[in-house]
Every structure is written in structure tokens, then in C-alpha cells.
Amino acid sequence: MMLEYVLFLSAYLFSIGIYGLITSRNMVRALMCLELILNAVNINLVTFSDLFDSRQLKGDIFSIFVIAIAAAEAAIGPAIVSSIYRNRKSIRINQSNLLNK
């Protein structure tokens, strides 16, 4: 019975993240929504790792790997956003066309 609640929470977080990522025009908000998506994936990995095979920690180890990737994204993402803001004076996604030039 607890599995359904955890999966519902994970699906709810994932859908909020996807909705925010699709509708967001601000780069900082898009990064926050990406973090929500990664956290929902981590919840699923840990839940299914515990459910199917609790002796082997493959899902837990992969979840730690995803957390490390999210930490790198949280460190590099704002640096890229601040660099774009310094050059373009805007952090709106639809106004940043750096690859067009």
C-alpha cells in the first residue's frame, strides 16, 4: 500500500517538473524544474530497488550517481545563466539565441 503513495508522489513531482520545463521562459525556473524531474527519478529508482531486490543496491547506487550529476548541473547551470545574462542582459529562454550567430 505504501508503494502506491510513493509512486504517486514521484509521478506528481515528475509531471510538475515537465509542465514547468515546457512552460517556463526563465532559465533559472527551467533549471529548478529539471531538478524536480531528477528528484522524481531518484524516488523511483530507490523505490523499485527496495521493492524488487533489496540485497543488491543497483538502484541506490544509480540514484547516488544521478544525485552527483544533479549537483554538477546545479553548479554549472547558474554559471552558464549568469554568463548569458552578462552578455545578453536577459535570462529568458526565447531571447537567448547564442547558437544562431
UniProtKB/Swiss-Prot annotation:
Keyword Plastid (UniProt): yes
GO CC terms in record: chloroplast thylakoid membrane; NADH dehydrogenase complex
Enzyme class: translocase
GO MF terms held by the record: oxidoreductase activity, acting on NAD(P)H, quinone or similar compound as acceptor; quinone binding
Gene3D superfamilies: 1.10.287.3510
BP terms from Gene Ontology: ATP synthesis coupled electron transport; photosynthesis, light reaction
Principal localisation: plastid
Alphabetized InterPro entries for the sequence: NADH_UbQ_OxRdtase_chain4L/K (IPR001133), NUOK/Mnh_C1-like (IPR039428)
Subcellular location(s) of the protein: Plastid, Chloroplast thylakoid membrane
Endpoints of the signal sequence: none
Reaction it catalyzes: a plastoquinone + NADH + (n+1) H(+)(in) = a plastoquinol + NAD(+) + n H(+)(out); a plastoquinone + NADPH + (n+1) H(+)(in) = a plastoquinol + NADP(+) + n H(+)(out)
EC number(s) per entry: 7.1.1.-
Protein task: NDH shuttles electrons from NAD(P)H:plastoquinone, via FMN and iron-sulfur (Fe-S) centers, to quinones in the photosynthetic chain and possibly in a chloroplast respiratory chain. The immediate electron acceptor for the enzyme in this species is believed to be plastoquinone. Couples the redox reaction to proton translocation, and thus conserves the redox energy in a proton gradient.
Family designation: Belongs to the complex I subunit 4L family.
NCBIfam families named among the record's database cross-references: PRK05715.1-2 (NF004320), PRK05715.1-4 (NF004322)
Protein name per its UniProtKB record: NAD(P)H-quinone oxidoreductase subunit 4L, chloroplastic
Species name: Acorus calamus var. americanus (American sweet flag)
Name of the gene this protein is made from: ndhE
